[in-house]
Structures are given as C-alpha cells and as structure tokens.
Amino acid sequence: MGFVLFSQLPSFLLVSTLLLFLVISHSCRAQNSQQDYLDAHNTARADVGVEPLTWDDQVAAYAQNYASQLAADCNLVHSHGQYGENLAEGSGDFMTAAKAVEMWVDEKQYYDHDSNTCAQGQVCGHYTQVVWRNSVRVGCARVQCNNGGYVVSCNYDPPGNYRGESPY
C-alpha cells in the first residue's frame, strides 16, 4: 500500500505544480483585463464628471501592435499615430493595468483645471489624456520586453491633448 502511494507522488506533484501555475497565471491575466483598464480610466473620468470610455478592439489591436514593437528594449517612444497614447514601463507584477493608469492619473496633482496648465517642471499630459472628454474609446495592451520588464500602451479615440483646449 505504501509503495502505491509513493509511486503516485510524482504525478501528484506534477498536477499540484500545474494547478499552482494556472492559478498564478490566471491571477496575472486577471489584473490586466479589458475591464481592469476600463475601471481605472473610468474612475478617474467619473471624478471630474466625464463620460466613461468604452473598449474598442481596433484601438486595442493598435496598442498591442505598437507595444510589441517596443518590446525589444522597452524604450518608451510614442508612435505618433492616429490615436492619443499613454505609455508606461515597469518591472514584474508591479506594472499591471491598474498601476499603469494609476501612474498617469497621479499626475492630476500637477494639473490646474482653472488655468488649464501643468505645474512648472511637472508632467500632466498623461492625466489629461485619460480624462479628455472627447476621447470615448480606448484600447490597451501589456507586453513583456526582452529585458524582462513590461510596457503598457493605451490608445484613445479620438485623441486628446489639443493645445489650448481643456480636457473637461
């Protein structure tokens, strides 16, 4: 009887390891779903009274394609394409959908809506794109770079951040 249990131990370990991998893998993907991107964006938009974004598969395909191009070195260079664009880079599980959008939304502290300006020496254009009232569709992608880091690209249709225009 003891021999039978011992002979089944390798199978048990294999199955247990596979299940653990699936749980971890699912957990990582679950933190980077379309809904995760939408929730993070739309919370920021609701805070300033802007209508929610909707997910657009065509915009997401553009984001995926461009993020894949950036994977060689994770160097954040904008595509200058037809969509508005926010990029983020980070390592490991830190760079999730929610974390990327949180980084952009954190720029709100530097944005003065009354004067429609950013504090001197600060960046707030990522935030203003997130809440740009005329941007109604979004698509995002997260890709692992060759250096082990991750790049997140979110694209917005129509684009925002027009000079002299207020985002909301």
UniProtKB/Swiss-Prot annotation:
Domain SCP: 38-156
Induction: Synthesized during pathogen infection or other stress-related responses.
Swiss-Prot/TrEMBL keywords: Disulfide bond, Pathogenesis-related protein, Plant defense, Signal, Vacuole
GO biological process: defense response; sexual reproduction
Post-translational modification: Three disulfide bonds are present.
Signal peptide interval: 1-30
Any one annotated GO CC term: extracellular space
CDD domains xrefs: CAP_PR-1
Entry-linked InterPro entries: Allrgn_V5/Tpx1_CS, CAP_dom, CAP_sf, CRISP-related, V5_allergen-like
Function: Probably involved in the defense reaction of plants against pathogens.
Family as reported in the entry's similarity comment: Belongs to the CRISP family.
Name used for this protein in its record: Pathogenesis-related protein 1A
Organism expressing this protein natively: Nicotiana tabacum
